[in-house]
Amino acid sequence: MNFMKRNVEKEVTDQLAYRRKMLQDWRGERLTGHQINLASIDLNLLVALEALLEYRNVTHAGQHIGRSQPAMSRALGRLRGLFNDDLLVRSSTGLIPTPQGEHLAQRLPSALRTIREMVTSRSVISKEWGRGATLAIPDHQALAVLPRLLPWLRERAPHLDTLACLPFDRAVRGLEQGDIDLAVGHIDVQLPGYFRRSLYTDRFACLLRHGHPALAQEWTIDNFATLRHAAISTDSPDHFGPIYDHLPNLRADRSPILFSSVLTAAVVASATDLVLLVPRRVATQVSAMLPLRVVDPPLEPAPYKVMLIWHERCHHDPQHKWLRKEVAAALETGAD
């Protein structure tokens, strides 16, 4: 009984081993017999095959792709070995495709067209591409540039999303992670991995309420220093640089009152004796909405440079290039 049991167990084991071997052989056949190593294929052979299947004449096909008749004959020989099929055979009317050749004639042009599209930049970008693209822009810059930018892009990229009031550090992370496509802002340094393009250079201006006592006095640096100033906190998404740190000649009596928003600071300045120093484009927009005067400061702060910023991962993308060009064209138009 034990002997018979051992024989049955051995037979089952042998059958399982045989099935495993058959499965391994079948998998090996699929990997080595039916899945060709693409690295070993010369793409030029497929280009030659496309021409041969179209013209069905070695000489004419060679002329079409700029190769000699002997070179095309050699290519046809290699193709026959690659596909293990004659592909094209002689007849009384010339070359005619085999069934495999007919099959390839139907599929090869679309496959090569896909490859060509992948490696060739498109010269014409559909304006529908703007769908889902995101432009990050701080709130104070939105005041200055969106009235001109949005009409410009309405026809060119109608689906562009604008994300306003975003802190610069978040915008930088968003560019790297792909959540944001472009950012507009002020940056003094070149960050590694990022590209920037200058849009325009602005100068600073003061915002004071109508009837401010300082307007009746001599507008000097000393008098300017005695005024109570408003400033935008460096932690604010509206922050446009530590402007008061860049004014070494200004010995203000007191530190400025910090605000998180240009508009909030401007509203307060319109009802008090605070003076607010902002980029002139921002000052012009704000003074059109609030009872504020725009006055040049009695000293010359460093210019305020506004940049278009993007990550290196998008630098060579043709669609992204198009969008950068359109945004830059809109913001550079009418620049100061």
Curated annotation (Swiss-Prot):
Domain HTH lysR-type span(s) in chain numbering: 41-98
UniProt keyword Zinc present: no
Gene Ontology MF annotations: DNA binding; DNA-binding transcription factor activity
Positions of transmembrane segments: none
Record keywords, A-Z: Activator, DNA-binding, Nodulation, Transcription, Transcription regulation
Pfam families for the chain: HTH_1, LysR_substrate
Highest rank taxon of the organism: Bacteria
UniProt DNA-binding residue ranges: 58-77
Function (record text): Acts in trans to stimulate nod gene expression via nodD3 and exo gene expression via SyrA.
Protein family membership: Belongs to the LysR transcriptional regulatory family.
Protein name in UniProt: HTH-type transcriptional regulator SyrM
Gene label: syrM
